[in-house]
Amino acid sequence: MKVTCEVEDIMANWPKVRYAIQQASLIVPEKERDVLVYNTACEILTGHRKIWILHDGVNIKAIVGAVIQKSGGAESVPSIIISPIFGFTPMTVEDKELLKKGLMDFARNNKCNVIYGYSANPKAWVIAEKIGMTFVAKVYKWEVV
């Protein structure tokens, strides 16, 4: 399930984001809706930034942003820098696996590396822990994993 939405600032355009999620849910048969739509990480395209939203059908559980850019080195490789924005707990094991799978599938389909970035935001740390990610660098220093 892919949702695209022209949004420059996710928080400033929150009603538009919620509307995009609601519209996505309408194209799925009702009996499959909870599983197929709200328990997947919906992608909302915001310029060069990808936003994954994990929704349980009632509340949004997590929002993770990822910037796609070229990494340095001998060969410039497209990379996803994962930068969690905020999230809510609790997230189940299934939740974290779905969210992680969405990110990894996107990376594989677009031949990207995955880079984890540091954030001092306590809510960002919660997301990192819940989806099994480890921050491997501090501010402005990145490490490919």
Spell out what each predicted region is.
Residues M1-V35:
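Short amphipathic alpha-helix that is part of the acyltransferase structural core
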Residues Q23-E30, L45-H48, R108:
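Membrane-anchoring hydrophobic segments
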Residues H48-R49, A128, G132-F135:
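Short glycine-aromatic motifs
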Residues I53, V58-Q69:
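Conserved beta-strand in the GNAT
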Residues K70-P78:
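A short, polar/charged loop-to-alpha-helix boundary motif
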Residues A41-I53:
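A short helix-loop-beta-strand connector motif used in the catalytic cores of GNAT acetyltransferases and
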Residues V77-I131:
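Acyl-donor binding region in acyl/amide transferases
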Residues T134-V145:
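Conserved catalytic-core motifs of GNAT/GCN5-like acyltransferases
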